[in-house]
């Protein structure tokens, strides 16, 4: 599933099957492994908007 506008960063990672649980999302995000629009993001509650680009490792997702 593609992340959609209004989702939190943690929800988006789960929806895209990049993590298996909210706890795993927390670890990955707080570990500095996630970038939003090229910047490291450590807040899993960050709301995403249309056009945001989320990157985790080699995976790249665009919010629609």
Positions of PLM-derived features:
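Short, charged beta-turn/beta-strand-edge "cap" motif at the junction between a beta-strand
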Residues: 58-63
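Short amphipathic
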Residues: 1-3
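A basic, amphipathic helix-loop patch mediating RNA/tRNA/ribosome contacts
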Residues: 5-47
């Amino acid at each position: 599933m593609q992340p959609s506008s209004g989702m939190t960063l943690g929800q988006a990672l789960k929806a895209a099957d990049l993590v298996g649980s909210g706890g795993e999302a927390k670890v990955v995000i707080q570990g500095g492994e996630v970038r939003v629009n090229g910047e490291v993001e450590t807040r899993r509650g960050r709301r995403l908007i249309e056009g945001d680009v989320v990157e985790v490792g080699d995976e790249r997702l665009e919010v629609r």
